[in-house]
Amino acid sequence: MSIRERLSGNEASAVAMKQINPDVVAAFPITPSTEIPQYFSTFVSNGQVDTEFVAVESEHSAMSACIGAEAAGSRAMTATSSNGLSFMWEMLYIASGSRLPIVLSLVNRAVSGPLNIHNDHSDAMGVRDAGWIMLFSENNQEAYDNLIMAHQIAENKNVMLPLMVCQDGFITSHSIENIELIEDEKVKEFVGKYQPEHYLLNHNEPIAVGPMDLQAFLFEHKYQQAEAMRNAKKVILEVADRFEKMTGRKYGFFEEYKLDDAEIAIVCMNSTAGTTKAVVDDLRNQGIKAGLLKIRMFRPFPVEEVTKALSHLKAVAVLDKTDSVNGAGAPLFTDVTSSMYTQNVHVPTVNYVYGIGGRDTTTKEIASVYKDLEKIAETGDIGNPYRYLGLRRRGE
């Protein structure tokens, strides 16, 4: 029987970590993820977990400690945000390239500079090619659920890759919502004990690893890493199926909200999906066939599945909470459009950059995007495909 609680996203994440009871947690505080290791350290002090909690002097050291723990055959977790993730950047590639299934709770925040402590997705998108599996969470419940599923995905012998669970800073991390927790024993059974077949620092299987990997082998090693990322798709669905049987909550690569008969749709991630659902409901009451595709699994990107879900539409808008500053489109937009192109599907698609630095995005603004899509669907004219939503113009 599930346990009804009222928790913030950070509290929910810390509770998930407590129930997982990893061997090692190494962390350095940074807003807005600070509360996760703070709450978890209380669990350690109270004897509710037997985790080795390592309070380090920087985020670089936090990831380094997790790498050392996983290399020694231990289950390791951490949490960070924004420039903390940036400081880990070097070690993120070492973690994935060494095939270490570390789990990271990433509370999304704008990357400096200028300094901003509020939410956008510039931190996550800055490491989208670092070889980490990336799951995004609309609300506190999903942040909790994704963390519970994370180890079973990352530690699968056909995957063995690190995984980050993303949630929106402050919007999700500090907002208190009703949430259904799973009983401790059920989580323990679901997550299981970490017993890797092989690990790098096994004294019974001594090897040299890490110092040098040149032309003779690196290409093949990176190919195997890419294959593991592709393998993760199947594993993510298998783990989600087990999770649904335990909780009744269903997860996939994405969520389709009133998309089956839709003519126009928005694609987005994280908490903005909740705002968009409210707009879709309102438009449906007006007789407008609007829908939503909420991406949950961003890495690996579900190319074929996203394309199939969007192929029947007359117009699509992709909302990005960061800007690539490349003149060609923001990250989610380029993934969606390249997916459709490679599958020979041509749906008029436009990009909206929104919410930079935590700027609120209102239902009125989301409704204006659907209004634009109606015009595109009617005329076939995309106009400027690279747009900004909620941007103040000079003098405003």
Which functions belong to the PLM regions below?
Residues 8-13, 241-264, 277:
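Glycine-/acidic-rich phosphate or pyrophosphate-binding loops and their flanking alpha/beta elements
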Residues 79-80, 103-107, 136-137, 164-168, ...:
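Short beta-strand segments
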Residues 320-396:
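Peripheral docking tails and interdomain loops at the edges
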Residues 41-46, 278-292, 341-342:
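Short helix-loop-beta junction
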Residues 162-255:
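Conformationally flexible catalytic loops at phosphate/diphosphate-handling active centers
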Residues 118-162, 166-169, 345-359:
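Conserved thiamine diphosphate
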